[in-house]
Amino acid sequence: KISAHNIELVDAPVSGGPRGAREGTIAIIVGGSDHQFERVLKILKFISDNIIHAGTLGSGHSIKLGNNLLNLICRIGTFEVVSMLVKEGVEPSLAVSIIQKSSGRNYATEVTLPDNILSGKMNQGFSTALMEKDSSSALQIGVRHKLDMTLGKAAHTILKRTISEYGSAADISSVANYFENETGARIQPRKEV
């Protein structure tokens, strides 16, 4: 119906969080035809140079959802392993710095833990409610394609437990609190009393 009014639709979700927005490096993931992508490119360049054509309409949204589910899986796996290492007697900051220089590195070891958890800020700027929405939608894509999504479901379950404990408005960093409570391993710096 919108094409009758000479209006075209693309999807262009973003990924990279507040840090990417501040630094102008946020990824803009565009779904639409080649022609539509070329038309919106000059406008989107005002926001970021990191613009990717993902394919047809809807592809950008699907990739963003998949990316956020993968981020959740990596985050939870990283917190689980760091908790285990803390229980083993390794300082969390040392564990993270070594993992970051090794094959287990990921966004959680590069940004989440150093900038938000180990620093004590606990403010990544993305709510558990938004992550729940995106990861739930990504899992629905898996259901549509009859995929088991074992890791995604497990990560989503832990996220839902975190929301149950800390609320849907809590920052996604609160997943670290969940692991601290579950394992007794302190990842965050101790607060001065």
Predicted features along the sequence, with ranges:
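Rossmann-fold dinucleotide-binding core
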Residues: 1-72
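ATP-dependent carboxylate/acyl-activation modules
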Residues: 45, 189-193
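Helical "substrate-binding/catalytic lid" subdomain
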Residues: 59-182
